[in-house]
Structure formats: structure tokens, C-alpha cells
């Protein structure tokens, strides 16, 4: 009984104490709905399907033609949101770091991979209270209250245990259990995961009154990848996210916080339907330039790391000009794609 009481006191001190803002202070809430596209506004039933987004468009300002970064992936885009620079400058040039020997299974989870200052670091320097829930590239970020986005890529540890290792402050996730937010066996997926993340965000936001909130909604992206951007499933996913946004609006309404609140709803990238998938690494394997062993890359002279609708081709020895010519010739003979080299990219795409 004494041990249980000690644990509860520790968790309660984490949950009830620590940095807290003031509701009269100015605050920014940045919500990213993964895969949110401007063309969903073309749906004739938009106002009925998405009443909360419609309200924000009516009462606030909106833009339907935002240009994302290159490459148009979740992690580069989210990092540009909080740095204001392109991936070429902030260093998160893909969802996954270039690690062919581990089959590119790891992602850019860690905030120390970002090469420039962020909103998070600036907020910390100015003594502002911050909350982050499932924000990409946030593991290790100096946020006051943070549940990072990270996923287990092997059988040695579960995703929920990884999150427990990296939340801030220590036992932030456990403290949410004390408040009845997280179920004891909480390792959900799909809509249940987004619902759980929403409960955690609302719990932290209400109790901590942060100056800066970063909140990432996920399932809209996964549904569009699985069923297509124009599917009924995608429409349902956006309707679900709209309802979560509605909970935040209701809290701001009930507590009369609009005068001190700037709320930003955005997406990170769009979607295009496709019929074919190109595997350049299979092409390189046929040429003997890449070796696979039980589906894993064991050796390579050239390799491609996919980046959504594009891919980065790298040579192990970039100084081998003769081999570079052979690779360029092979790629130029394919009709499924075009080749862009750095000299072809304008500043909007790849400003370094």
C-alpha cells in the first residue's frame, strides 16, 4: 500500500505540478491533419460533412492552394512548419534517414536530427509552456509536456514502451492513466489511436494552458494510402477529424479564449491516385548493382530511397563518374518517370 501511494504521489506531482501557462496569455494551437487537401472543398456536401472546418473558414481566414515542400512527405513537411525553411536547410529530407543496411526501416524520430532552430527551441528560450502530441521528429525535443511520435520497428520492444521511454516529463503517459485518459492496455491503432491521442492532448491542454501546442492527427493519411483519396473511407476519416477539431472549438468557446488564441489547422501534403508502383532497386538488382539477402539489402553500388511520388538515387561512391553515367543512362531509358538533378530544381523546391 505504501509503494502504491508513493507511485501515485510521484505521478500526481508530475501531472499537477510543472510548467503551466495562464489562460490570459497569448497562445498558438497548430493542428496538422495528415493528408488534408484543399480539393476536399470541392465536395458539394463539404459544409454538412465538415461543420467545424466550415465554421473556421467562415469566421477566420483560409487558403486552398498551399504548396507543400519537396519531398512532399510527412516528416519533411512537419519540420518545415516549425522551422520556416525547406528540407534542404533543416535536414529532414525524407521520412526515413538514409540507412540502406537496415532496409530503411527507421524513421527520423529524433529532434536532434533537425539542423536549424525550431519553434520549440525558440519557445523554450523564451520561457513559454509547450505541449506536443504525436508531432513528427519530436523525440528528445525540449517540450514541457510531450508525447512523441515513435514506432517500434522490431520485436524487441513495443511501441507503447518506446513512447514511455521518450515522453516528457518522465511518466507523462502514465500520468494520463491516473486521470483516466489512457486505458491500462493502451496500444490502440486506427481511429482508436487518434481518439486516444486526442484525449491526451485535451487533458494536457486543459490542465497546462500552454502557449504553444503542436498536435498531429494521423488516420486521414493512412486511410487515403489504403483506400485512395476519393474513397468513402477517406471522407469518413476527415469527418472524424472534423469532430475532434470540434471538441477543441467547444473548449475555446466555453472558456471564452478566442481573444488570446490563434488556431491554425493545416495539412502536410496532398495525395494522387496511382495505378503502377515503380521499384528502382529491383532494376538495380537486375544490373548486379544491388544485392538482396532474404529481402534485405546486403550490399549496393547504387540504391533508391523512395519519397512518396519521387525517389532519391544515391551512389555509394559519388566520385565514380563512369558508373554515374551508366546509372543515368539506365534511368533515362525508362519511361515511367523523369529524372531531376539538383541543377533542375528551383529555389521553391530545393533551396539550400
Where are these regions (language model features)?
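Active-site-proximal N-terminal segment of extracellular/periplasmic enzymes that hydrolyze or transfer
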Residues: 18-61
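Loop/turn elements at helix/coil->beta-strand transitions in domains of secreted/extracellular proteins
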Residues: 24-29, 59-62, 126-131, 208-213, ...
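Structural recognition of the beta-strand scaffold that forms the well-ordered cores
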Residues: 29-32, 63-65, 80-82, 130-134, ...
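His/Asp/Glu-rich, glycine-adjacent segments
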Residues: 86-228, 335
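Bacterial Sec-dependent N-terminal signal peptides
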Residues: 1-24
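A long, amphipathic alpha-helix that forms part
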Residues: 23, 40-41, 191-215, 220-261
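Secreted, luminal/periplasmic, and some membrane-associated catalytic domains
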Residues: 26, 71, 97, 101-111, ...
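Second-shell loop/turn segments in exported
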Residues: 37-43, 66-68, 78, 105-110, ...
